[in-house]
Amino acid sequence: IIVIMDKTRKHLISLAVLTAISAIVPTATFAQLHLEIAKAPEQAPKIAIIPFTNDSAIYPIIENDLNRSGRFTSASQNLPATASINQIQAGDWQNAGVPYVVVGQIKNIDANTFEIHYQLYDVQKQQYLLNEVLTVPSSRVRQAGHMISDAIYQALTGIAGDFSGRIAYVLRNPQTPAQRYTLQIADTDGEQPKTVLSSRDPILSPTWTPDAKKIAYVSFETKRPAIYIQDLATGQREVLASFKGLNGAPSFSPDGQSMLFTASMHGNPEIYQMNLNTRQLQRMTNDSAIDTEARYAPDGKSFIFTSDRGGSPQIYRYSFDDSSVKRLTFKGAFNARGTLSA
């Protein structure tokens, strides 16, 4: 049960506690996944993903990825005769109203290696936008499908795709008290889930390191919130922050050398920065307000955070150059959980 208080400051206190230590969430959420909700194009362009020659596994992955993006509509009915590498008749696809076609083929290089040749064809321009070859081990064929989706998405939108990334999330299962909370990682389509940690106690705020080799999270296994970091390859974990009071909302610097987090070791929830090599702490905010949800800017020169220092929860920017703080949001009575794009 999540209780939202009526008064604004109580609401932000609730938010700070939820971000840093909240234990009670109804289902699987809390992923290191940025969700941008926007109006989908009224007529998303059609794209035909033709089954690859000698393979039936990759094209459904690409089709699913592009459909999930909301930027394209999969064309699957009343299509021209099956196209293949270097064999696309532009006129047939123009008549079918399909502006983009993806074809490909897979070849065995040896028992453990595949060569994947794929093409993205622009029907209107009658030219190939992509004509690429990937060589991958057999164990990474599925990952190659996501990589192809990334390339197609960027070629058509100008924006880098992230289908080949991974997501981290927490599952809560009240039916199994011994493993009520499970931290998992998976492909962006939810496939190939892997359990990182199972616990009777709440797990919150999973956060990737920039190199994606480790993940930080908040655990209540000692009956109070603490921030841990875990190596995904070895499973080795260590405590980063277990100070008196709240410890939560970890965020790594772009170079992976520092971490911002919220702590109340001195009574009030403030933002601290930890040097991950020396474990030295630096207090970044110091006032009577609730300061939480710090996130580094992509260039590492500043960070944004949520604070009620102006009377209501709003987003602020802290500059490392001069320690100045600037309010960024003014419209609305509640603005929180900001992130900065590159």
Name what the model sees in each region:
Residues Q124, D187-E191, D231-G235, N275-R279, ...:
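Short loop/turn segments that connect beta-strands within beta-propeller blades
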Residues G161-F163, P210-D211, P254-D255, P298-D299, ...:
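Residue-level detector of Asp-centered blade-edge/turn motifs that repeat once per structural unit
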Residues L33-H34, E63, N86-A151:
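Amphipathic beta-strand/beta-sheet edge segments enriched in Tyr/Trp
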Residues I167, I215-A216, G256-L260, G300-I304:
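Hydrophobic beta-strand positions that form the internal "hydrophobic ladder"
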Residues H34-D92:
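Short beta-strand->alpha-helix linker/helix-N-cap micro-motif
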Residues Q192-L197, Q236-A241, Q280-T285, S324-T329:
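A short beta-strand motif characteristic of beta-propeller blades
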Residues A160, R172-Y181, S198-D201, V218-I227, ...:
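A flexible loop/linker signature enriched in serine peptidases of the S9 family
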